[in-house]
Amino acid sequence: ESIGYSRGCSGTHVAEGIAELSLTQELANKTIRTEGGPVTDFLARADFEIGIQQTNIMVDVPGTDYVGPLPGFLNKPCQSNVGLLTASKESDAARAMIRFMVSPEAAPLLRRTHVEPINP
């Protein structure tokens, strides 16, 4: 009956996928673009029947069932970035954390949270 997706990166990809499938008009009255929280919050309240967002946000949320990733071209990654505050009081520790986050050693930890590591 209804599909919810965010206004962020994953929601932009959903809207593009709907357009690529030529379903924009057909689904116009059935889609809800959320803001103000994860799609799963709205899904758990039954604001819509199907929710679409990044896997790491969808998994293990009470009141919802994670079904799986979208197929093929509909499953586009959302890029994440990291930065360092120039006035940081712990800049050495922050730089060490950033180096770890992009290291091969971090890959298994990231994958456990359904985040794909970068491919430098």
Regions from the PLM with identified roles:
Residues 1-120:
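Exported/periplasmic ABC-transporter solute-binding proteins
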